[in-house]
């Protein structure tokens, strides 16, 4: 579906099975009827967020300026998925915001807040709210950005969209109590206009975020707190696992970097998919 300059939505085909278009792409089309067009060209992208494994890649959104990772007090969220999203954002030089939703669940919120403390400590912005009650604290962070909401299913992304844009009518569903997980309610990425300068993309919930397209250095750079110790290891090609003279392991033992973050780095760098 392509939005034309006048705001009309036009169903469009792509040329060939390998033609990949992402939500947020700016394209040139050719009308083939009053009700359909063909995408002829995708204009150069300023940014591209995507995930990948050894066999394929999945485009998520193009030309975004900010990633908003939505986590919740309940169901519990994955530290690794959060870290992977932030690595991908750092690679594309995107502004980042972590939203902790469902803060009305007080006991669960305390646990989630502690889980996010290492991210606050290294400078990530964390916004706490309850989308069902009041999503307005998020609005100032959206101004002037093309933002994308990402996160696991059940975190409340669609509820946020509906609170910010009541006419959007994004589908929502209760989480599975037995599985402590959400079900996919958004089936494809969709772009919404907040105003002429601010736009918001909602994408399907993700359970995995492969980073096969990023090399070791890009993943290391995505752990922003490691930058202060770059080049201090005994070996220039240190992978910060078992090597003697590793500055990061020494720093972690001294309590200067969070042990959980170092462990996450080791796991992600050894298994980028």
What are these regions (language model features)?
Residues 95, 105-155:
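Canonical P-loop GTPase G-domain recognition
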Residues 19-33, 43-67, 94-96, 103, ...:
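Helix-rich effector regions associated with P-loop NTPase G domains
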Residues 153, 158-159, 163:
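Walker A/P-loop
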Residues 22, 38, 62-64, 80-94:
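Switch/coupling subdomain of P-loop NTPase systems
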Residues 34-43, 76-77:
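Short, Lys/Arg- and Gly-enriched loop/turn segments at beta-strand edges
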Residues 70-78:
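Short, glycine-rich nucleotide/cofactor-binding loops
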